[in-house]
Amino acid sequence: MSLVYLLIAILVIMAMILLMSKRRALAKYAGYIALVAPVISSIYFLIQIPSVAKLQYLSTSIPWIKTLDINLDLRLDGLSLMFSLIISLIGIAVFFYATQYLSSRKDNLPRFYFYLTLFMFSMIGIVLSDNTILMYIFWELTSVSSFLLISYWYNNGDSQFGAIQSFMITVFGGLALLVGFIMLYIMTGTNNITDILGQADHIKNHGLFIPMIFMFLLGAFTKSAQFPFHIWLPRAMAAPTPVSAYLHSATMVKAGIFLLLRFTPLLGLSNMYIYIVTFVGLITMLFGSITALKQWDLKGILAYSTISQLGMIMAMVGIGGGYAQHQQDAIASIYVFVLFGALFHLMNHAIFKCALFMGVGILDHEAGSRDIRILSGMRQLFPKMNLVMTIAALSMAGVPFLNGFLSKEMFLDALTQTGQLSQFSLISMIAIVFVGVIASIFTFTYALYMVKEVFWTKYDSKVFTKKNIHEPWLFSLPSLILMVLVPVIFFVPNIFGKGIIVPALRGVSGGNHQIDPLAPHVSQWHGFNIPLLLTIIIILLGSVLAIKVDWKKVFTGKIRQISVSKGYEMVYRHFEKFATKRFKRVMQDRLNQYIIMTLGIFMIIIGYGYIRIGLPKVHQLHVSEFGALEIILAIVTVTIGISLIFIRQRLTMVILNGVIGFVVTLFFIAMKAPDLALTQLVVETITTILFIVSFSRLPNVPRSNANKKREIIKISVSLLMALIVVSLIFITQQTDGLSSISDFYLKADKLTGGKNIVNAILGDFRALDTLFEGLVLIITGLGIYTLLNYQDRRGQDERE
């Protein structure tokens, strides 16, 4: 099956979900219909594993806008396959979990599942895209769909603010990324990603290479919540828990990491890129791990833990980026080891983080709270969630016999090996190891502290008073399955490593299959070495900090109020006030003012063009024959037009405006265009009558007195627009480079059977345009009728 067919299948499912929204009896089954989408995509991508492992990549290219090299280019290689599997398989768990989490009585299920399926569709689109502009479209589609999901409970103020904040930051990054893609097109002349990566050596010497890297980093850092662009992610917790579980584990926050991995063969050629990504990742990891301890809300703890874990993965992506420079060197194996660790931890993080969010969702759903000050001793009431969240949290902390331990060991090993890499000095290595270890200690601390406070403290019935707590099996099933995978991957890591991660490494390297022998064999035991020693230190210090320190009392008062997001909120409020003032100044409910502003901007643009290229030069002007009638009609039109500026009576203005229309009708008659004259006459008559009739229903508000300054502006704008239109006519007459389409119409109108050229254009050459114009009028009429009918019924209901 083609990749396009897969995307179409998902779109069909989305359409079915929308149709179900019209029938309330079927709406409760929307989740199960939506579940088909991740199931189909999972089966499809699982089937492709053997082919991709044998270097048999799928690709599809459908021409779209050829002149701009924008095509529907899709490609399934090892990297896109790994991300697609994570998106799809985690999607099955999340979609099923959502069917148990949401209520068909309280929630609009078709709307929710449409948004969620759109979210999955856009993420799969990103990882399959082999065209930069197509990737950008899907990139922004994730921002739009996440906005809709975060604001799903739109009556909640936190949901509204969180949705706006995430949308503003990620769209800003997306626009920066688009600029980077345009720079790539300027440097290479193509939008095809495979072709771009093939020109990496040429691009690195271009003057736009460094600016392009910064644009890419802005896009990646905003999407993957790297410091200081992380602030949108905790606010996104206002979304329903299934959304949080999906967003944090498998979708949007991983898009930035995917972007950097996909373009590693190009971006890794710059040492500056390696430094920035490595140190921003480590700072984000440290900041997220410390800030997680400030939180009382379980979702808040997990949000900052995601920020920290993303920083950890990002740091490994940065260190491993040097492979682009040293593919044939002896140290290439170190870079490959680090990239393998990044991909391995990305997969592990998706599993344990999704399980953690599902556990928190069940606690919130059944206990009615996520506050660790209220929840205590929950192991008695939630034995299954105690097991799920404890194992998942310990995996995140890097405890042995769980999958997180293996990838955390690879992370520590990568840090200690940076001293052997040419990009890092001894001082850099010491700083990297120090920050990484401190961040890992706090990671262990918040993971252990979270489960200790919720499950392993003494149950206090005075604080937590809710009764009749239960854990439905179907509700718990997805998180239990994910929990089982945590130790399973620890014992059989190479099944996933050889079948999924190694092919993904080929994608990171730009399709270089020679990377396979350099890929590490994951072992549970490496003997006593520096990473193991660091792990022991992390576990000991982290345990002490988690058990002995009451972090609820540490971050209090002014310390708790310190937040990076406060700066964003302050800037946002100032911009909002500024925008409101400007809006009120510009939008004064005066149609003529809007027209003047619109035409003014248009004239500025045209005027700038004339300044750059010079005024049009008239070599030979072809003027149609005209007589006394045309001169008289022109004088009448101009005279009436000028008089309209000074007349105060509205009825007189409407009548004179109609007179201008009738004069235009006479122009058409003089030009021997009876069809146009008849059409103009009918339209002008109806319009004038409607204007006059409408006055009987409007209040008799006198027109404001003439303002000399305002009238001068109106006359000036009118005259300038007239000059611009005339100059454009001159330009078109002087242009000989392109053949006129009029000749085609004149030669082909006989074939249409029309009586004249106008009939032929409207009825044949522009038949679809005419059809859709009619449809627009019909839809507009139906919309007006619906609004009027709604208002009538509403007024009737209020009277009753």
Swiss-Prot record:
Top-level lineage group: Bacteria
InterPro entries in the cross-refs: CPA3_Na-H_Antiporter_A, MrpA_C/MbhD, MrpA_C/MbhE, ND/Mrp_TM, Proton_antipo_N
GO biological process: monoatomic ion transport
One Gene Ontology cellular component: plasma membrane
Entry membrane topology: Multi-pass membrane protein
Transmembrane feature ranges: 1-21, 33-53, 78-98, 118-138, 167-187, 207-227, 241-261, 273-293, 300-320, 331-351, 387-407, 424-444, 472-492, 527-547, 595-615, 627-647, 651-671, 676-696, 712-732, 768-788
Record's keyword terms, sorted: Antiport, Cell membrane, Ion transport, Membrane, Transmembrane, Transmembrane helix, Transport
UniProt GO molecular function: antiporter activity
Compartments where located: Cell membrane
Principal subcellular localisation of the protein: membrane
Oligomeric form and interacting partners: May form a heterooligomeric complex that consists of seven subunits: mnhA2, mnhB2, mnhC2, mnhD2, mnhE2, mnhF2 and mnhG2.
Family: Belongs to the CPA3 antiporters (TC 2.A.63) subunit A family.
NCBIfam families to which the protein is assigned, alphabetical: PRK12646.1
Name recorded for this polypeptide: Putative antiporter subunit mnhA2
Lineage: Bacteria, Bacillati, Bacillota, Bacilli, Bacillales
